[in-house]
Amino acid sequence: MNIERTAASSAKRLRYALLCAVALNLALVVARVLLYTPLLAQRNAPLFVLEPVVLLLIYAVIASVMTAKRGERWHTVRRTGTIIGLITGTMWVVNLSLETFSRFSGILATAPFLLGAFVLWGVAGGIGAWRTGAAFPGIAAAIMAAMICVLITVAYGFLLTYTSLPRLERDLANSPDFLRSGWDDLRAFAIANTFDSGFSHLLGALIVSTIFGAIGSGVGLLLNRGAQRRPSPISLTDA
């Protein structure tokens, strides 16, 4: 009974944390637009604002569902997803910092952080499936890890439009995307580009974590079944 109460309490805390993270990201988007309203005058600019907002609301729904589930399986999903999510979120914040502020921003410098996170999401899937003996909890653990990771990363990226906007503008001044966009406001483009990147990360994380989570779950199930088939020392002695 105490174990069930502890699991329910941890699920509530996680739900609160995830919904707060979603609310923070939404607030950062809305406040950024209000602080620079010329953004909305650019072509298709409202779309760049709405895309991450819609996905963040979807994240809130998914988080609410996954933290409302009861039982040992879902406790495993949440615990595994949270640990891997915090680790990979830290990795992606480091990666984004390198891309923004460091000379070491090439693919060789950032790929280990990006691809490493994908692999760890697969590990979350493997752990979830191995511990529960079912594929779906493994995939759910990978998705949970990815959601936590990307909510942290996107919040950090949105914060950069407040703290480092001139640097973002300089980096995009000669960007082919800016030159092709037809926009005449570099600051607005830098903000919209950040929103678009946030949208891409939010969407991509769900897709990639599902794929890697499924692969990891397959491996986890094989390990689980292999462990079940292995005879125990007691049974060997009795034989």
Residue ranges and their predicted role:
Residues 121-157:
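Cytoplasmic juxtamembrane interface segments
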Residues 2-120:
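Transmembrane alpha-helical insertion/packing segments
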Residues 171-177, 227-239:
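Short, highly charged, low-complexity non-transmembrane loops/tails of multi-pass membrane proteins
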Residues 50-53, 180-214:
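Hydrophobic alpha-helical transmembrane segments
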Residues 28, 87-95, 117, 121, ...:
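Alpha-helical transmembrane segments of multipass membrane proteins
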Residues 60-66, 121-125, 198-229:
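Transmembrane alpha-helical segments in integral membrane proteins
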Residues 152-181:
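Functional transmembrane-helix hotspots
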